[in-house]
Amino acid sequence: MTAALLPRVGIGVDVHPFSPDRPLWLAGLHWPGEPGLAGHSDADVVIHALCNALLSAAGLGDLGTQFGTAEPEWRDAAGTRLLTETVRLVRDAGYAVGNAAVQLLGERPKLRERRTEAEQLLTETVGAPIALSAATTDGLGFLGRRDGLAAVATALVFPAR
């Protein structure tokens, strides 16, 4: 197999502090009754980490490169809009998404009740299987103090034929 045909892997990370005056969006879903996250767009850490992983795998940089905070059209943008545009950029660069996995890090909200719903939404948006998991830091650090949320993602892309 030549290097041009090898799959590529990307890693993405995103972190946002809580902002109680904003709605919480995670994995493209609204979480009523939970404090939101501060950010230029909707601050959906799950989708932002996924976008970073996809962009990294395709050699396209990261969210800041593609959707910078200096660009007003991305102000308060929905994570699903960013993800749809990211997938378009990845495809335009000549890649197809194989799959991705995202892990949400934080004490709350609890993902388990909405995991299937979130995975379905992400999978439909990307057009490839997306797995979602969660972990806590057992009370350690800013995540353990409930100051914010983080997410880490990996993505696999293949050259489109």
From Swiss-Prot:
Cofactor(s) annotated in UniProt: a divalent metal cation
GO biological process assignments: isopentenyl diphosphate biosynthetic process, methylerythritol 4-phosphate pathway; terpenoid biosynthetic process
Pathway per the UniProt entry: Isoprenoid biosynthesis; isopentenyl diphosphate biosynthesis via DXP pathway; isopentenyl diphosphate from 1-deoxy-D-xylulose 5-phosphate: step 4/6
Function comment: Involved in the biosynthesis of isopentenyl diphosphate (IPP) and dimethylallyl diphosphate (DMAPP), two major building blocks of isoprenoid compounds. Catalyzes the conversion of 4-diphosphocytidyl-2-C-methyl-D-erythritol 2-phosphate (CDP-ME2P) to 2-C-methyl-D-erythritol 2,4-cyclodiphosphate (ME-CPP) with a corresponding release of cytidine 5-monophosphate (CMP).
One Gene Ontology MF term: 2-C-methyl-D-erythritol 2,4-cyclodiphosphate synthase activity
InterPro entries: MECDP_synthase, MECDP_synthase_CS, MECDP_synthase_sf
Family the UniProt entry places it in: Belongs to the IspF family.
CDD domains: MECDP_synthase
Binding site residues for 4-CDP-2-C-methyl-D-erythritol 2-phosphate: D14, V15, H16, H40, S41, D62, L63, G64, F142, R145
Organism: Acidothermus cellulolyticus (strain ATCC 43068 / DSM 8971 / 11B)
Domain of life: Bacteria
Protein name per UniProt: 2-C-methyl-D-erythritol 2,4-cyclodiphosphate synthase
Positions that bind a divalent metal cation: D14, H16, H48
Catalysed reaction equations from the record: 4-CDP-2-C-methyl-D-erythritol 2-phosphate = 2-C-methyl-D-erythritol 2,4-cyclic diphosphate + CMP
